[in-house]
Amino acid sequence: MNMLECTCFYFSTNAAVPQQVLEMEELRALTTIGIICEYDPFHRGHAHQFAEIRRIFPDAAIICLMSGCFTQRGSPALFSTSTRAAAALENGADLVLELPTAFAVRDAEHFALGGVSILERLGFVDYLSFGTEDELSVLKPAAELLEEPDEAFQSRLRSYLAAGLSHAASQGKTLEERFPEAKEAFHRPNNILALCYLRALRRLGSAMQPLPIRRKGDYHADTLSIGEFPSAKAVRASILAEDWTAAKAACGYELPRSPICPPTALDQALLFQLRNMTPEELRGYAYCTEGLENRLLFAAK
C-alpha cells in the first residue's frame, strides 16, 4: 500500500485524532507499525529501518509520526514538513502524521511520551519501531526499573545528582551499578531514547509491542563515510556545505536544493528577543531554571 496522495495530518496537543485517520479501515485491517521520527533529512539509515520492518512484516502499514518545523535540537528543521513527509512516503511510509511542537522540542522522556500517546490514541497501531544499539533483553529490565524505581535506586540517583552530575549521567551511572554486565548500553544515544519509548509504553499501559531495529553505522558521526550508514548530523553538514553529491549518496535520492532553513536562520530574532527580556520573564519558560536564565542573558549580550 502506498498513500502518496496523503499529506500530513496536524495535531494540536489537546486535539482529537483527525476523523479521516480513524476512518482508514485499510490501515485497521493490516499489521500497523508506528515510528516516531524527525527525518531531517530522510536517509539510508531510515530506509534500512523500513526494509527491516518489511522483512519481518511484508504486508505491514508504516505510520510515521514526524516532527514539524522544529526538531528536538530546538532549531528549525532544514527542510519543510511537507518535503520531509514526501521523502518518507516516497521511500515506503504509508501515512505521515505531525508530532506537535510541544512534544517535538522536549527532552527525550517527553518526546517519547508525547509520541507514544498519539500513536496509542489512533487505536490501530500494533508495534512501535525504534532504533537501538543493543538487544531488547538488555533494555527492557532497565526501562521497568526506571519507571518503577526502588528506594535503593532512587538513593543512588540522588547521590549522583548531589555530586553535580546531569540527570542523564546520573541515571546512566545508577543503571550501570544495577546492570554491570550491560553498563555501556546505558550511555548510547539510541538506547537512551529507546528506554524512554519502553517507559512510555509501560506508563500508558499500551497494547503496542516494541519492535527494535538494530542500528548500523555511527548515527552521531560528524562526517560522512563512504559505504556506511550515515548520521543525520553528517548529512546536514554536507547539505549546509552544499556538497550535494555526498548528500545524495548518503540519502539515496536527489535532495531538493531549496528552500533550506539553516540553524542560524533565527539567530538575529532570538538575540533581539533575549536582549529585551528580564531574568524573571525567562524563568517562565520550561526548564529555564537554576541560573540558566542568567547564562542565556549573559551570552546574548
Task: Label each PLM-derived region with a short phrase.
Residues 86, 90-100:
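A glycine-rich helix N-cap at a beta->alpha junction
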Residues 9-11, 23, 99-301:
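Active-site cores that bind ATP or allylic diphosphates and position pyrophosphate for catalysis
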Residues 1-6, 11-12, 17:
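Short terminal hydrophobic/aromatic SLiMs and anchors at protein ends
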Residues 26-84:
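N-terminal catalytic cores of NTP/NDP-binding nucleotidyl/phosphoryl-transfer enzymes
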